[in-house]
Curated annotation (Swiss-Prot):
Family per similarity comment: Belongs to the TonB-dependent receptor family.
Keywords: Cell outer membrane, Membrane, Receptor, Signal, TonB box, Transmembrane, Transmembrane beta strand, Transport
Predominant localisation class: membrane
Pfam families per UniProt: Plug, TonB_dep_Rec_b-barrel
Tagged with keyword Amino-acid biosynthesis: no
Membrane topology: Multi-pass membrane protein
Protein name: Probable TonB-dependent receptor NMB1497
Keyword presence, Transport: yes
Lineage top rank: taxon: Bacteria
Amino acid sequence: MRSSFRLKPICFYLMGVTLYHYSYAEDAGRAGSEAQIQVLEDVHVKAKRVPKDKKVFTDARAVSTRQDIFKSSENLDNIVRSIPGAFTQQDKSSGIVSLNIRGDSGFGRVNTMVDGITQTFYSTSTDAGRAGGSSQFGASVDSNFIAGLDVVKGSFSGSAGINSLAGSANLRTLGVDDVVQGNNTYGLLLKGLTGTNSTKGNAMAAIGARKWLESGASVGVLYGHSRRSVAQNYRVGGGGQHIGNFGAEYLERRKQRYFVQEGALKFNSDSGKWERDLQRQQWKYKPYKNYNNQELQKYIEEHDKSWRENLAPQYDITPIDPSSLKQQSAGNLFKLEYDGVFNKYTAQFRDLNTKIGSRKIINRNYQFNYGLSLNPYTNLNLTAAYNSGRQKYPKGSKFTGWGLLKDFETYNNAKILDLNNTATFRLPRETELQTTLGFNYFHNEYGKNRFPEELGLFFDGPDQDNGLYSYLGRFKGDKGLLPQKSTIVQPAGSQYFNTFYFDAALKKDIYRLNYSTNTVGYRFGGEYTGYYGSDDEFKRAFGENSPTYKKHCNRSCGIYEPVLKKYGKKRANNHSVSISADFGDYFMPFASYSRTHRMPNIQEMYFSQIGDSGVHTALKPERANTWQFGFNTYKKGLLKQDDTLGLKLVGYRSRIDNYIHNVYGKWWDLNGDIPSWVSSTGLAYTIQHRNFKDKVHKHGFELELNYDYGRFFTNLSYAYQKSTQPTNFSDASESPNNASKEDQLKQGYGLSRVSALPRDYGRLEVGTRWLGNKLTLGGAMRYFGKSIRATAEERYIDGTNGGNTSNFRQLGKRSIKQTETLARQPLIFDFYAAYEPKKNLIFRAEVKNLFDRRYIDPLDAGNDAATQRYYSSFDPKDKDEDVTCNADKTLCNGKYGGTSKSVLTNFARGRTFLMTMSYKF
């Protein structure tokens, strides 16, 4: 209640200012020519006239921008990865784009926005039991509608700094100006793309109209429609093998070995059939010796069934199932814009409907922006937005190998209201002060249409009765022994952010001082399942007269597993300050310091494998202290009158306290009450999100350079980073179909993936223009240095060493996942030719991965997936392999009678030819 009282005075003040000045504007308009005209003295202002795509080289922050993305043939992942310090969490099954800044990703670590509106969608993919599934935050937006991307690293201002730990990224969608040229009344924008190597069709059309009014204002309207198809059974580099068939030959050789060694069979290549190997002793003894053809056929079929059900999954190293990753999407964009003398507003609707395999993703976005600009002291901006996301899973969809018994639907709804005013003051001694005061209300909600009890860890059904864990005797039991409900898929809950923010920019001569601050009040509530072994235990927890007890009380059953809610609140203050100077075109230095926070998410606080064992609402907010130093260079006329040079170099150091990750260990207060079902079953360990005890340190530098001579141009980006950020226990898991019963308790459900950036990475582009700039020829080189991925092996933390203990008062062990280093990838070269026979009609042909190199994309979800291991005993001297294996012997520890061996088959796309056409008229 206290925050609402604070809000009222500011809201009334801003509303009063708005109404007063709006009335003033109307009166001034009616006065017309009667108004007196005041003649001001001439004011001479010298300022750099910098093109939009070059402004980053004069901005005293660690910022990057990319323009005209809708014209590009590059996918959004590659565009983001061309920005130093920025990356993406690539996932073929997510249907979204998930941005990474300096090794941090996800809601709150990176404030990913579309047209200034924070994106909160949480994508969760299904899995038949091989890879383990995946989940991640991101933006559901069609790149055909994106006009530009702005990335801010390590600092903040305005509403972009709300719940933003590492920085922000804003995807700007098309506006009327992008479609209607100059003073034209109508405009049309077309784009189409096709190609080889499983590149499907991609097309977009947008139409716009603008009408100029007598007052000088304009009204514009825009509608766009986009469709695309995505196929994933591409050919990898270095041989042309399809990714979906990778490892098939190896699997076939393993099958033959099994038939020969265990079945005493041999393959007759002439008949194409298996037959008895009469040289083997087995066929000399009864009953085998008297087998007729029918009995032999049955014998072969039994071996084939045993291979398919028990052994083939252990040797299957196919990285993906392309048939389950076929993607089709259709999107719409509608905008209505009014641009007046004093007032501006934009109303927009955007949707994207995506189907990936059997899963449907439906996103709807509504937004209204209003601006009132009257004088230097009144520049009022109002933004209201509503985002809705749905994921629909049909009956039979599987999560970590366990199927849904009924249709299942999850949803995410977000409401945002932002109000701010900017004032500019002319101070003595040629000093200028600009301030912005604002308030932001943000409500974010996650929910589902039902509680899927069939996904519970100990649920007993047909899908649970398979795999190695079932063969060895899995953990199971009725309500009298174990909680039956789990919150592993889409935890439900709500978040409320109430934020006051203030920006100030002081400018004098060549110096500039910027300061931004905000205070965030955070309230949350989420669902979890309780477990009470008796009526008395339930009564003691809530009281006999409580609504909860009355709602769930059932004296006949004696065991209670109610779905309950738990609430909490937190608060944080954030600051960002920077100082810069403009000593000339060649040297514009800047330095900044920021303290930022990230609030725990619903998924971190309410995920739970068993009952409420994973619930942890006492998580502390993450806190980052970031120092940055850098300089800009922007010079026009370096070697000739109209060439331009842009350079930005930034070094940074960051320390993060209370880093949130999930660990495997005991979750209860060791000095408090021990859960009754723990003491009776001995199942003392589970996955829970916790604050990392050590501080996380990051440091690195980022370079961005652009030189344009006219005939010749080049772009260079390069980033280097070292980080001590820990992994999550859920970053890698055993394959569900091959897990032992112990490993079934350690399934990570695809909750997370490694997010640490490659040690270094970069991109160099060189091009030249001919035929009066109608023909552009160019090429780009992509470089990825050493990177890491998670393995299934455990790393013990918090002073533990892996020793188990039956004493429930002792910590025992806490573990996350080990990592292994992926070597520097080969250089990847792309080539393109663009021809513009008439203005704004562009044909572009290009070759991706020109030399057909075989390489791995860093931070691809498939790198950490369970498909990148095979699960069986093996002979280390065995050379019958066609996969790249890790030589680290610590990964082959023979646990549970077998070995988890690491492989590398998740290769990126090989040589691909693309053709793009875009036309604007």
